[in-house]
């Protein structure tokens, strides 16, 4: 459906954020050096008492991931860890080369969405066959336990959402990313890791088409379904039509019939949904943000933003809390 070509930048602000992670590679792929963030005992005994989490739990602590890697989380002995950034490969990603969670492979956002900036692509998810192919290239199937992290909260959430939509049954994100991992005193490494290609995903992709809303469905449901709420996860200035939020979008405004779900200060953040330490808020935190909004959690909530990144953060928080009356209007304001 779409080509995996990085031709048009998502936005100056967003790319600036991601460029901190991905730039020129100053290290060779075969470097074996490892660093420690702090002197801290690194034993399996230390993480044996970390509490387990449910399969649908998305946001986990660094301590939980370390416990899983230490073999102290039953069923997560072979977890696949991946750093998410915007780009085609690990060797061009500066943050990955400078140091990543041990064992982490590299996954680019361009593996799940059209990044050509074309009118047809609209930064929507790639075709089911393309996403399945990219998952299999990393050895990821529906039964793989996946833990993602990245320097951009919404970019990482975008990939997690795509994996869940595709059918990966257990997808998690290290809340706070590599900074939280380092703060916990855990090691990083610099060697490049790659998964072993898998042959069969194990189910039809997408396994959860209900989590994706098209522009046609959004228009129809806004007009004809009182329980359907098209929820804008955009800044106040975007919501009020003062700015499109993007240097490649001339028109400002919102789809007719949409309601505002707050979430952002600019097109490049989800500041309303994060704590002071950079972690994503829990459900109670989201409820506080939404207490004056024109929807309830009993509505079907189709989240959208500019191109589909910010909208995935509230989706994941509701998903991990058992809500299924949720989706992402993928095309967003751009489409």
Predicted feature descriptions by range:
Residues 19-37:
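Bacterial lipoprotein signal-peptidase II cleavage site
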Residues 23-27, 44-335:
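Cytosolic catalytic domains that perform sulfur/thiol-centered chemistry
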Residues 2-25:
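Sec-dependent N-terminal signal peptides of Gram-positive bacterial secreted proteins and lipoproteins
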């Amino acid at each position: 459906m779409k080509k995996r070509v990085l031709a048009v930048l998502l936005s100056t602000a967003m790319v600036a954020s991601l460029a901190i992670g991905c730039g020129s590679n100053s290290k060779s792929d075969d470097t074996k050096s490892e660093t420690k963030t702090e002197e801290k005992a690194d034993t399996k005994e230390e993480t044996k008492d970390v509490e387990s989490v449910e399969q649908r739990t998305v946001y986990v602590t660094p301590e939980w991931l370390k416990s899983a890697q230490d073999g102290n989380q039953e069923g997560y002995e072979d977890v696949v860890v991946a750093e998410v950034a915007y780009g085609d490969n690990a060797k061009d990603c500066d943050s990955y080369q400078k140091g990543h969670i041990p064992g982490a492979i590299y996954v680019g956002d361009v593996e799940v969405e059209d990044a050509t900036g074309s009118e047809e692509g609209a930064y929507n998810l790639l075709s089911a066959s393309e996403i399945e192919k990219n998952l299999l290239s990393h050895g990821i199937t529906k039964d793989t336990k996946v833990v993602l992290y990245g320097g951009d909260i919404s970019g990482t959430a975008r990939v997690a959402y795509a994996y869940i939509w595709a059918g990966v049954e257990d997808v998690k994100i290290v809340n706070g990313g590599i900074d939280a991992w380092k703060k916990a005193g855990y090691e990083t490494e610099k060697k490049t890791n790659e998964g072993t290609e898998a042959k069969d995903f194990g189910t039809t992709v997408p396994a959860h088409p209900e989590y994706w809303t098209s522009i046609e469905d959004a228009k129809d449901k806004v007009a004809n379904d009182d329980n359907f709420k098209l929820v804008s996860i955009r800044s106040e200035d975007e919501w009020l039509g003062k700015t499109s939020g993007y240097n490649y979008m001339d028109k400002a405004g919102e789809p007719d019939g949409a309601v505002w779900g707050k979430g952002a200060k600019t097109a490049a953040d989800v500041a309303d949904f994060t704590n002071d330490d950079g972690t994503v808020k829990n459900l109670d935190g989201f409820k506080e943000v939404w207490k004056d909004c024109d929807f309830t959690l009993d509505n079907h909530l189709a989240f959208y933003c500019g191109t589909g990144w910010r909208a995935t953060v509230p989706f994941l928080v509701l998903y991990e809390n058992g809500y299924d009356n949720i989706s992402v209007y993928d095309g967003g304001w751009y489409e």
